[in-house]
Every structure is written in C-alpha cells, then in structure tokens.
A protein has these predicted regions:
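Alpha-helical transmembrane segments within multi-pass membrane transporters and channels
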Residues: 97-136, 180, 279-280
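Alpha-helical transmembrane segments of multi-pass integral membrane proteins
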Residues: 31, 36, 40, 166-200, ...
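Transmembrane alpha-helical segments in multi-pass inner-membrane proteins
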Residues: 230, 240-281
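Single transmembrane alpha-helix segments in multi-pass membrane proteins
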Residues: 31-96, 120-127, 257, 264-274
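Transmembrane helix-bundle core of multi-pass membrane transporters
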Residues: 125, 129-192, 218-221, 240-249
C-alpha cells in the first residue's frame, strides 16, 4: 500500500515539475502583470500597453531568430552589431540612391550575408559558435563605424519613417511585424521538417547526421534567418530613430538570449517553444 502511495506521489511531483518547466515563466509573468495592474495606476491603459508592445517589438523579432540558434545548440552574438550595421547601411544607401526599397534590400542583404558567414564557418569549418559570432560581432560593428564614418547617418527620405511610426488597426506597425514573425517562426519550428531537423540537431547532432538530417545546410539556413530578422529589426529601429546609428544596440544580444532562456528555451539545444520568448522580454 505504501509503495503505491509513494509511486503516486512521485508521479504527481514529476508531473508538477514538468508542467512548471513548461509554463512556469507564463505563471510568473501573469502574477507580475496582475500585480502591476492592481498597484500601478494606468498600467493597463491602452497607451501604456502600446508602449510596452513597442518596447519588446525589436527584441521579439530578433528572439525569433535566436530561438532557432539556441534550439540547434548554438547561439548568435552578432545580432546587436547586425541591427546597428543594417540600420546604417539602409540609411546610406537610401541617401545615395534615393530609393527606399533599394536601401531596405541592402540592409536585409547585409544581415543575410552576416548570417551566411556565421553559418558556413560554424557548420562547415566546425569552429565554435562563441568564437565565430564573437568575431563577427566585432567585424560587423566595425563595418558600421566605417560605413557611417563614426557618426549617425540622417535619412533624407521621410517616407521611410512610416515603417516605424505607421499605425495598422490602431497598433504601431512594429508590433504587427513582431506578431507576424512570431507566427511564421512558430509554424516553422512546430509544423515543418526544418523545425524538427533543428530540434534534432540540438538534441544530438551526430545522431541527426546519421539519421539523414542535412546538418550543415540546416545550420546555415538558421544563421541566415537570424541575420535577416536582426537586419529587419535594425531597419525598423533606424526608421523610428530617423537615422542609422553605429553605436546603437550595444549589448543587445544578451537581452535577446535572456528573453529566450527565461522563456524556456534550453541553452543545451534540442528544446524550444516558439511563443515563449515574450514573457522573458
């Protein structure tokens, strides 16, 4: 009889621990949010909620890409530098070409190239992600200072500012773009072969390779995606600041990684849940 009771208690404890592991951050977030609503005047006002949404929109976009890096067992320390350099590149190209779309394309291309370099060096050359992305972080940040001559680059085309200040259905555009990223990356992680391959690589890279998973290609794509969303966040930030600034977002990579980890993403890889970065933010 006692053994049955002990077994039941063990199962109950294990079940609670697993539920807490999956939803603990959501519970903490809910408690803090309710506490702020009760004790902080006007906290739940629509204006304040919009401000909070804008505050986490950039980190949210970048966290969508970082989530895949962490799920595969790696991480990307270059995201903050890509944010700054993409904003500067976009500003310079818009001013030189007088083309809004060419400037945005140049910023996104820079992010994709940065991710491609990271992915190739890490996946093909087998160099540690810490060393690789730390080097890329310094190189891309230096490139931002070179392109901008160490100064903020003002943007002359005022149409570009609508990207950061436009309101769609009553909410700022960056919030909608972040929600779109969350949905797209969530479907990519949970509903596609690419997402399953990412988790398999993070769980056991050698076993995934033996099972036929294209490890090198998958890792390269992951880092390209991380570079792209970081560049997109940098372009939106430049739009809101009305200039590209090479010194912005310093240390931002730690905020993004913390948001993912606090949201339940494992630093060891193989475990990730796409909607969980926002409580960490």
């Amino acid at each position: 009889m006692s053994s049955v009771t002990t077994s039941g208690a063990t199962r109950s404890t294990f079940s609670f621990a697993r539920i807490w592991d999956q939803f603990g951050m959501l519970v903490v977030f809910a408690v803090l949010f309710i506490g702020c609503v009760i004790f902080v005047p006007n906290f739940a006002s629509f204006v304040n909620m919009k401000g909070l949404g804008l505050a986490i929109s950039m980190s949210g976009m970048v966290a969508c890409g970082m989530l895949f890096c962490l799920a595969s067992g790696d991480f990307d320390l270059s995201v903050a530098s890509v944010i700054a350099c993409a904003g500067v590149t976009t500003a310079v190209v818009i001013n030189l070409s007088e083309s809004l779309w060419l400037g945005i394309a140049a910023g996104l291309l820079l992010g994709a190239l940065s991710g491609l370099v990271n992915g190739f060096v890490i996946a093909r050359l087998k160099i540690n992600a810490l060393i690789t992305t730390l080097a890329t972080m310094q190189i891309v940040r230096g490139l931002a200072y070179i392109i901008s001559d160490g100064k903020a680059v003002g943007i002359e085309d005022e149409r570009f500012f609508t990207l950061g200040y436009a309101n769609w259905f009553g909410l700022p555009a960056p919030i909608w773009l972040t929600v779109a990223c969350l949905v797209v990356f969530g479907l990519l992680l949970n509903k596609t072969t690419f997402g399953r391959n990412t988790l398999a690589i993070g769980g056991n890279e050698e076993a995934a390779r033996l099972a036929g998973v294209p490890v090198v290609r998958t890792k390269i794509i992951i880092f390209v995606l991380s570079g792209l969303v970081s560049a997109a966040a940098g372009i939106i930030l430049a739009s809101r600041m009305t200039s590209g600034q090479p010194m912005t977002s310093i240390g931002y990579e730690l905020i993004v990684i913390s948001a993912c980890v606090l949201g339940g993403v494992s630093l060891k890889g193989g475990s990730a849940r796409s909607p969980t970065w926002w409580p960490g933010s």
